[in-house]
Amino acid sequence: MSSILIVRIRGSASTPWDLQEVLEMLRLSKQYSAMVYPKQDDIVGMVRKVQSYVTWGELNMDGAKALMARIETVKGALDQSFIEKELGLSTEDFIKKLVDGELKLNSIPSIKLPIRLHPPRKGFKGKINSFIGSGGELGYRGEKINELVRRMV
């Protein structure tokens, strides 16, 4: 099983209440917030319901390393000492388990969720209110989500 990364692109203005509830269930209440989940049918179903507000794809090692810089704990940034002390893992093992879907970020109580990101450097390549296939930024983008995350960290 692998992990998927979901990033909310659009804001909350004029969002229907049912889609807003699904976004809150996914912990994506604000624009440019991100979450990592194991790839399961129920999560993918919720993401497809709100795909006009988010972009998502499979997380790989490079994207997870970049994303690690933005994960915060109660005591500050996520660093090697926290991972070794709280989880008993090395940094590489933590990233590998996160990418493989074996580790859930929401199961670690001292990590602040969701992961807050910046708008991408050099802007979006397409429109933020249309889908990837039609020259936009929304919807499923596969492995290209990692390139977007590197620009948003």
UniProtKB/Swiss-Prot annotation:
InterPro entries: Ribo_uL30_ferredoxin-like_sf, Ribosomal_uL30, Ribosomal_uL30_arc, Ribosomal_uL30_euk_arc, Ribosomal_uL30_ferredoxin-like. One of its GO terms (biological process) is translation. CDD domains: Ribosomal_L7_archeal_euk (cd01657). The keyword Nucleotide-binding does not apply. Gene3D superfamilies: 1.10.15.30, Ribosomal protein L30, ferredoxin-like fold domain (3.30.1390.20). GO terms for cellular component: cytosolic large ribosomal subunit. The keyword Transcription regulation does not apply. Keywords: Ribonucleoprotein, Ribosomal protein. One of its GO terms (molecular function) is structural constituent of ribosome. It comes from the Archaea. Belongs to the universal ribosomal protein uL30 family. Part of the 50S ribosomal subunit. This is Large ribosomal subunit protein uL30. It comes from Metallosphaera sedula (strain ATCC 51363 / DSM 5348 / JCM 9185 / NBRC 15509 / TH2).
